Design a protein with these regions (language model features):
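A generic alpha-helix structural signal
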Residues: 35-38, 111
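Generic N-terminal amphipathic, Lys/Arg-enriched alpha-helix
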Residues: 10-27
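N-terminal hydrophobic targeting/anchoring segments and the immediately downstream early-domain regions
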Residues: 1-10
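Short, acidic/polar
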Residues: 9-14, 80-84
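N-terminal basic, low-complexity leaders that serve as flexible interaction/assembly modules and, when applicable
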Residues: 4, 22-36
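N-terminal signal-anchor module of multipass membrane proteins
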Residues: 37-45
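Active-site-proximal beta-alpha core segment in soluble small-molecule metabolic enzymes
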Residues: 51-127
Length: 127
């Protein structure tokens, strides 16, 4: 697996060169390392399904790449109902909302997406 070890690594020098002259701040993702990390998770999963946590990757395109990298990745664990509705509107399926919600706007958005065929599972706390 490729590694990044900080300012002394060859990757750091490559990043500095690639970003020279760019207006900062910006987001830069080494997709090779991202997918290597995903492959490592798959290898350690023992074949068990892995649900991608959206709060760890806030970029839809990167989420799509990780999900497509292995059939072991199955669905997305969303931070909020609103986020689940947003992801469903952008073609994501098999969504689970990690935290209970009573936000009427977010719940209406989820219901609208479910009416259009989205699969969104909401969690609840039972007293």
């Amino acid at each position: 697996m490729p590694t990044f070890t900080g300012p002394s690594s060859p990757r750091y020098a490559d990043y500095r060169e690639r970003l020279r002259g760019e207006h900062l701040p910006l987001a830069y993702v080494d997709v090779e390392l991202l997918l290597a990390n995903a492959a490592d998770l798959v290898a350690r999963s023992g074949g068990k399904p892995i649900r991608l946590a959206s709060k760890s990757i806030r970029c839809r395109e990167l989420m799509r790449r990780v999900l497509a990298s292995s059939p072991v990745f199955q669905g997305v664990l969303c931070f909020s109902a609103g986020e689940a509705a947003h992801l469903a509107a952008h073609g994501f399926t098999d969504l689970v909302v990690a935290y209970p919600t009573v936000d009427a706007h977010d719940l209406a958005a989820v219901c609208a997406q479910v009416k259009h065929g989205a699969q969104i599972c909401l969690m609840v706390d039972e007293p």
